[in-house]
Amino acid sequence: MPAKKKEVRSKLEYIWLDGYKPTQNMRSKTKVIANFSGKLKDCPMWSFDGSSTRQAEGGSSDCLLKPVALYPDPVRENGYIVMTEVMNPDGSPHESNARAKIDDDDNDYWFGFEQEYFIMDSKTQLPLGFPVGGYPGPQ
């Protein structure tokens, strides 16, 4: 009897912007997929309850998450971060989906994420080089 191939399970963290105003919040949920290829084309569309994110009324609250970018998750083994756009059930862009309004042929738009890090002094518990008793004070 041939050896059974071990199933590899991947965690896909779907991320989207909710419908809160004036400032949208990031939302996410995780889908576990067996033997995922690691390619964007193999990320399935997924739905969520838009009434809890101010993107739909209670009676007809399904919204769709359309994967548009895929990145390896630096924190989780076999993990991926799936950036998505919010779509209506008919596949049209949701009104909160400002990304869909960007003209793909216009190369003047640049977007990026910024992550800040601090190296802490283990003795003073302050950022390295910060004067003890100096300013600014704790926030």
Regions found by a protein language model. Name each.
Residues 1-139:
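Glycine-rich, acidic/polar active-site loops that bind/position phosphate-bearing ligands
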